[in-house]
Swiss-Prot record:
It holds the Pfam family LOR. InterPro entries: LOR, LOR_sf, Tubby-like_C. The modification N-acetylmethionine is found at M1. The keyword Acetylation applies. This is Protein LURP-one-related 15. PANTHER family: PROTEIN LURP-ONE-RELATED 1-RELATED (PTHR31087:SF160), PTHR31087. Might be related to the phospholipid scramblase and tubby-like superfamily of membrane tethered transcription factors. It comes from the Eukaryota. The lineage of its organism: Eukaryota, Viridiplantae, Streptophyta, Embryophyta, Tracheophyta. GO terms for cellular component: cytosol; plasma membrane.
């Protein structure tokens, strides 16, 4: 069975030595916050049409999350499931908006009362990915709670706390023979201490949606 790629820092380096971001903390659920860095390995079977073709594991290969792909006719909705198949969050794209916008809800809900956060492009025309994240209580959206910047195609995106330079998660790509010949896209995401890794996993799903729309445009 294929072993997922996991990015590892040399001992004494990497995010474990970085200060904890002030804007970190719970977005989805406290159980997804750890006092140490979390490395998540992501494998996407790009040619697969089966449910759960987007898989996220921990460093030991244990399943953390999988994505329930939209059925035909419902391409604006995806669900992030935990390892047991229970909905963690539901992601829905709002089709009518000046800037592409995604809403993320708790569990399997799409009720506005269960809105956790909203994501939108920083601008309509972008050479590289720039997304702003607004938590559910941030109604006026004058200042973002998180930012995503980088290149999805190169799998080099970084998540920042608010408008600061404090990094809360970053992505690393891994090229393998299997990724080239078997149509699998392997990369990993390092989540910094005390940052909700279910939240970061759901951002990765949105980044994937953004990229697929850009390629289809």
């Amino acid at each position: 069975m294929e072993q997922p790629y996991v990015y590892a820092y040399p001992q004494g380096s990497g995010p474990s030595g970085a200060p904890t971001p002030q804007a970190g903390g719970v977005v989805v659920d406290p159980k997804y916050c750890a006092p140490y860095p979390i490395d998540m390995a992501i494998v996407r079977k790009m040619m697969s049409l089966t449910d759960g073709n987007f898989v996220i594991t921990d460093v030991n290969g244990n399943l953390l999350f999988k994505v329930k792909e939209p059925v035909f006719g419902l391409h604006d909705k995806r669900v992030l499931l935990d390892g047991s198949g229970t909905p963690v969050v539901t992601l829905r794209e709002k089709m009518v908006s000046m800037h592409d916008r995604w809403q993320v809800f708790r569990g399997g809900s799409t009720d506005q009362r269960d809105l956790l956060y909203t994501v939108k492009r920083s601008s309509m025309l972008q050479l590289k990915t720039k997304l702003d994240v607004f938590l559910g209580h941030n109604k006026d959206e004058k200042r973002c709670d998180f930012r995503v910047k980088g290149s999805w195609l190169e799998r080099s995106c970084v998540v920042y706390a608010g408008e600061s330079d404090a990094i809360v998660a970053q992505m690393h790509r891994k090229h393998t023979v299997q990724s080239v010949f078997l149509g699998k896209d392997n990369f990993s995401v390092t989540v910094y201490p005390n940052v909700d890794y279910a939240f970061i996993a759901s951002l990765v799903v949105i980044l994937d949606d953004v990229n697929r729309e850009d390629r289809a445009a």
